[in-house]
Amino acid sequence: DLKDKKPKNLGENWVAPNAVIIGDVTLEKNSSVWFNATLRGDIENIHLGEGSNVQDGSVLHTDPGYPLKIGKNVTIGHLVMLHGCTIDDNSLIGIGAVVLNKAKIGKNCIIGAKSLITENKEIPDNSLVMGSPGKIIRQLTDDEIEAVKQNAIRYQENLSLIHI
């Protein structure tokens, strides 16, 4: 029942005119939701952290007992599917990746394009993960961690350039 579930905007952010956000969804400041993305908080809460972005065509959803939490400065790439999972701060989820219920992605991670993170899988901080099912390839370098952070910052800076 969506009657009591309404999106909450906790600061300046940007949502594309054709993005869909329904139900119990929280958008922190400097976050952005891009074209054709869908955030369905009709079952559990979806929380998009400060400075995080959800790119074009991505779908975020939940199941009973499995809310979806995205930390600060996270980049959710194009056509990503997130379902009832946790993505910690300063991580990047690559184009077309899928992360399922109760999976937890640590801080400063890169989940490669088209990777599948199965239910209940925990990825430790600073990991590069690729494949289906996703396997830890190696630890990220300091330069790679900084590049992920800078990617999220570029999306935040773009918010001031958008004209509708």
What are the residue ranges of the model-derived segments?
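Structural signal for interior beta-strand "rungs" in well-ordered beta-sheet cores
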Residues: 3, 8-129, 134-136
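C-terminal end-helix/capping segment
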Residues: 138-141
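Adenosine-phosphate binding glycine-rich loop
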Residues: 143-145
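A non-catalytic, amphipathic alpha-helix used as a structural packing/dimerization or gating element
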Residues: 147-157
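Conserved small/polar residues in nucleotide/adenosyl-binding loops
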Residues: 162-164
